């Protein structure tokens, strides 16, 4: 199990974003063997008619023997989440009551053309799960309804016994026997979900990778809060990823000092910013004791480019080059992303 990826690859059409996911991220970074474990790769495409029901799950009518019945069909996210839980269960050492992290297979949910659907409506409350802690689990949990929770349990292999009122009475997941709810909760405590209150978290072995064509950015608006939950990787027109290696800040105090100066820079350019109150950056915008250059580039610099200075890039031009007449040097985010080292040094000395 590797560190989870939560990233949107973006760039012009035809730059090889999907190819990069299939040929590099899935086999090399996530170590998923598509030939051996195809169930660990779940793909979908967002479009204007794609809904929360397609993503999470929905009740659909079917006719059997002349009678109409309703079945709940899981969506792409629920299927990916259940598969990730299932892989954790299969790596759980029931004798020593511990997880063997190195044995847990990764799962990836791939969303093509994420901005062609109404992302905020499609994700719904799942948006809350996109915040991850240092362990890779969601920082917060959400509650889901009984039908959705039962479907997750079915997908991971749980069998149910029902009482005379049609309510679930006992749960069975091999090698455990059939047990009551409280006992079953204790047996599955390592999955970080609450059977009684029906709460879930995204586990660290579930990555979400999406693609977005910049030419389609106006199809559906993606709000800043949604964008901040992702890393952004720009794919240039030559199909190369602009991603710098190395550590930018080796400690939290260094990072926090940098953020204070960055906010001073942002406030000094308030005339170029609409709604400056929510355009400043908090200390936990990027988490971890060490801050990588790639995170500065793909998350922080993208936020500045796309959300803070989206109306006017002159403050960034002035910061990097000291001359506002060099606007031609900073046309695309790719141009800005190339300047990660210069950007860091300029903010440090601001």
Protein language model regions, located:
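C-terminal regulatory/interaction module of P-loop NTP-utilizing enzymes
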Residues: 1-350
């Amino acid at each position: 199990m590797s560190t989870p990826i939560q990233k949107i690859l973006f760039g012009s059409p035809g730059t090889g974003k999907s190819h990069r996911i299939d040929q590099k991220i899935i086999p090399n970074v996530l170590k998923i063997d598509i030939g051996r474990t195809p169930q660990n790769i779940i793909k979908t495409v967002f479009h204007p008619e794609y809904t929360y029901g397609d993503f999470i799950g929905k009740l659909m009518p079917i006719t059997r023997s002349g009678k109409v019945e309703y079945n709940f069909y899981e969506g792409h996210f629920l299927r990916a989440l259940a598969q990730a839980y299932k892989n954790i269960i299969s790596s759980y050492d029931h004798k020593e009551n511990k997880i063997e992290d190195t044995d847990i297979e990764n799962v990836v949910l791939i969303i093509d053309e994420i901005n062609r659907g109404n992302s905020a409506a499609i994700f719904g409350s799942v948006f809350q799960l996109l915040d991850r802690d240092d362990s890779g689990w969601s920082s917060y949990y959400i509650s889901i309804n009984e039908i959705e929770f039962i479907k997750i349990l079915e997908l991971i292999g749980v069998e149910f016994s029902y009482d005379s009122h049609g309510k679930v009475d006992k749960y069975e997941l091999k090698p455990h026997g059939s047990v009551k709810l409280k006992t079953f909760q204790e047996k599955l405590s390592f999955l970080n979900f609450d059977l009684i209150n029906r709460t879930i978290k995204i586990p660290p072995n579930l990555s979400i990778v999406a693609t977005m064509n910049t030419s389609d950015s106006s199809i559906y608006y993606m709000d800043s809060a949604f964008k901040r939950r992702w890393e952004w990787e720009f794919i240039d027109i030559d199909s190369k990823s602009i991603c710098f290696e190395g550590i930018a800040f080796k400690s939290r105090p260094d990072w926090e000092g940098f953020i204070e100066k960055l906010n001073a820079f942002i406030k000094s350019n308030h005339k170029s910013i609409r709604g400056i109150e929510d355009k400043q950056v908090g200390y936990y915008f990027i988490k971890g004791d060490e801050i990588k250059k790639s995170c500065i580039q793909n998350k922080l610099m993208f936020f500045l480019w796309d959300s803070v200075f989206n109306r006017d890039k002159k403050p960034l031009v002035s910061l990097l080059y000291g001359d506002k007449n060099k606007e031609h040097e900073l046309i695309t985010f790719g141009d800005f992303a190339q300047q990660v080292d210069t950007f860091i040094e300029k903010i440090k000395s601001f």
